[in-house]
Amino acid sequence: MPPRELSEAEPPPLPASTPPPRRRSAPPELGIKCVLVGDGAVGKSSLIVSYTCNGYPARYRPTALDTFSVQVLVDGAPVRIELWDTAGQEDFDRLRSLCYPDTDVFLACFSVVQPSSFQNITEKWLPEIRTHNPQAPVLLVGTQADLRDDVNVLIQLDQGGREGPVPQPQAQGLAEKIRACCYLECSALTQKNLKEVFDSAILSAIEHKARLEKKLNAKGVRTLSRCRWKKFFCFV
C-alpha cells in the first residue's frame, strides 16, 4: 500500500508513546476597582468614555452612578479594571459613599479651569474618601487640560471675577501634601495623557494589593508562630 499523503493543514500522527502536549492554563484575571470622584461637570464621565470607548460625549449629562469595565494586559497578565463614575452633587452623597468600600484606587478629579473644584479636593473629596476607605491610594487628576489656554474660557473667568486656571505647581504641591501617588493633567477631548492616568491608576492599585497581601501573609505567620509557642510552652 502506498504511503498516505499528508495535507499541509493536517499534522503528522504522533507516536503511540508520545503523550499529547499539555495546554498552558491562562493566568487568572486580576480585578481592580477604580472610583472617580470630584465636583459635577469636571469631566469624570468624559474621561471614562474617552478611555473605554475612544469617544467623547456630545453634551454634559449629570451622572448618578455608572460603571464601566475594560480588560488590559500588564506584563502579559490580564487585568480587569472596573471604573466607577460617581455624581459630584450633594444630592447623591449617600449613594456615592456606598461604592467607596473595597475600592483599590481613587481618582480625585478637578477641572484645571474651575478653581472651586480644586479647592473642594481638600474640603470635600479627600475627607470623604478617607472616612470610608483610609488605605486606598489616591491619584490627583487635573481634567480639561485642553481648556487651560482657551481664550474664551480665560475671558469668562476674567469677566466672572474668578481666578485663572489652577497653576500646575500648585496642583503638584497639593498632591504632595495629601500624599497622592502622583498628579497628572489630561484631556478627554484630545486624549492627551489620558492613557497615562489610567495606567498609573492600575499600577498603583496592583502595588497596593501586593502590599496588603504581604501584610496579611506576615500577620498569618506571626499568629501561627505564637500558637505553636503556646502549645510548646503548655506541653513542657
Curated annotation (Swiss-Prot):
GO terms for biological process: small GTPase-mediated signal transduction. It comes from the Eukaryota. Keywords: Cell membrane, Endosome, GTP-binding, Lipoprotein, Magnesium, Membrane, Metal-binding, Nucleotide-binding, Palmitate, Phosphoprotein. SUPFAM superfamilies: P-loop containing nucleoside triphosphate hydrolases. The keyword Lipoprotein applies. The keyword Magnesium applies. GO terms for molecular function: GTP binding; GTPase activity; metal ion binding. A lipid is attached at C234 (S-palmitoyl cysteine). SMART domains: RAB, RAS, RHO. Coiled coil: none annotated. It is found in: Cell membrane; Endosome membrane. It is a lipid-anchor. GTP binds at residues 38-45, 85-89, 143-146. The modification Phosphoserine is found at S25. Plays a role in the control of the actin cytoskeleton via activation of the JNK pathway. Interacts with PAK2. This is Rho-related GTP-binding protein RhoV. It comes from Mus musculus (Mouse). The gene is Rhov.
